[in-house]
Amino acid sequence: MRRIKIFDTTLRDGEQSPGASMSVEEKVEMALMLEDLGVDLIEAGFPVSSPVQFEAVKRVAEAVQRPIVVGLARCVEKDIDAAYEALKDRPKDKRMIHVFIATSPIHRKYKLRMEKEEILERVRKYVTYARQFFDLVEFSAEDASRTEVPFLIEVYRTAIESGATTINVPDTVGYALPDEFGELIRTLKEGVPGIENVDLSVHCHNDLGLAVANSIAAVQNGATQVEVTLNGIGERAGNCALEEFVMALKVRKDRLPYETGIRTELIYPASRLLTHITGLIPARNKPIVGENVFLHESGIHQDGVLKHRETYEIMKPSDIGRSSETLVLGRHSGKHALRKKLESYGIKLDDETFQKVFEKFTELADRKKEVYDDDLFSIVSEVLKEPLNGYRLVHFHVHTGNTLLPTAAVVLQVGNEKKEAAETGNGPVDAIFKAIDKALGLQPKLEEYIIQAVGTGKNAQGEVKLTLKIDGELYSGRGVSTDIVEASAIAYINAINKYLIAKGLLRKNGGVE
């Protein structure tokens, strides 16, 4: 099985996505995650462009051990010098320079104002210059997919003769179709002298939504390296998404006999870290990492998944490091899904009682987009005429400031029982979580925390979704409020209540067993 190198450019091309800029420290944190994920190369930045970019490349090169660290440079002497200065302390076999120049007619005429001969001379001069400092040199012909093929062959021949160890074929504006891009790669593979001695890389943009398809077509026609970003972030519509490309190979290995070094179980944690750093939340229906990917609301789909997951799922959530909660209850849900959801919390009802619960559930589902677990607990409590909601937040107080140690106090109540506690923390949200832990005598581990706005303007609310690990199992919670700390506390208590209910730890008259 042929191995495909994964060249990750999240920290360089991905960061060029509007709103995705990262500090030096954030780039280092992300680079360490990418190393754990198993990427082969990390393009850390464009050293000549600013002191911050230079420092980021240098710091990433110092932080990671296994991957090759790459610095970008134009075919300009000062760019190459800056890349060398940023990477010179890294072992020669673990550092690479990526030099590029545009080659398409529109770029030659309007951007560079150069003739073909001038382009070839620059390639020859600056790839040769780069090889004085780097054993590993990648050369890219920017806008390759819109460049005349005979000229493109000549450009890559010149780059290889001048010492390039990787040639990269960018579909810079996402213009190519899979069949023509695959044909281009095959033509280059057959027509460029010496290409068999170097890596053949592709860098596809997603302007027509074809970045992953084009990358797969390239691999099928001889490419040995694919350039990607996490969550597909990047210029304009983004780049080939690491998670989509890798999982396509994994899921369809019957037709795609290629492997990568990616630890797929770390894909979702890596995606969440990037979201946390940049604030860019993937669309709910984003393949692989979107919130809806493993969720089913249709009753027919839910029934099928409950009987056998592969009826409607081509991969397991655990394959990418996600929890296995898959049922979203709404107006399309049926009895099977509702009963399964209740049983997951230890709530077993006889047929007559369940029918009453189901009728109230369908009434509520017709009025709401989604029925949450708290809604279910309220319905069951109403039908059974006994409390099932667990703890609620009666009162909280947070004391914080830029010169103060954040402190939170909470009052929680279930039935007739109240519990109070106060704690300090690393910020107001952390403080209130610790106060809740202290009040309930629990030590959950926060696995995931997502916050997003609901609505706009001064009346916008914050929605917090989080996941806790308690006794080795995962429990999700949701909270909404105009106050982010309150929304966080509600979500935290919501997740804990699910644990208490599932384990049968809530007494009917209130309190914990």
From Swiss-Prot:
GO cellular component, one term: cytoplasm
Gene3D superfamilies, per database record: 1.10.238.260, 3.30.160.270, Aldolase class I (3.20.20.70)
Region (Regulatory domain), start-end ranges: 392-513
Pathway where this protein functions: Amino-acid biosynthesis; L-leucine biosynthesis; L-leucine from 3-methyl-2-oxobutanoate: step 1/4
GO terms of biological process kind: L-leucine biosynthetic process
Binding site for Mn(2+): D13, H203, H205, N239
GO MF terms, alphabetically ordered: 2-isopropylmalate synthase activity; acetyl-CoA C-acetyltransferase activity; manganese ion binding
PROSITE patterns: AIPM_HOMOCIT_SYNTH_1, AIPM_HOMOCIT_SYNTH_2, PYR_CT
SUPFAM superfamilies attached to this UniProt entry: 2-isopropylmalate synthase LeuA, allosteric (dimerisation) domain, Aldolase
Location, primary (coarse class): cytoplasm
Cytoplasm found in the keyword field: yes
Keywords: Amino-acid biosynthesis, Branched-chain amino acid biosynthesis, Cytoplasm, Leucine biosynthesis, Manganese, Metal-binding, Transferase
Function: Catalyzes the condensation of the acetyl group of acetyl-CoA with 3-methyl-2-oxobutanoate (2-ketoisovalerate) to form 3-carboxy-3-hydroxy-4-methylpentanoate (2-isopropylmalate).
Protein name: 2-isopropylmalate synthase
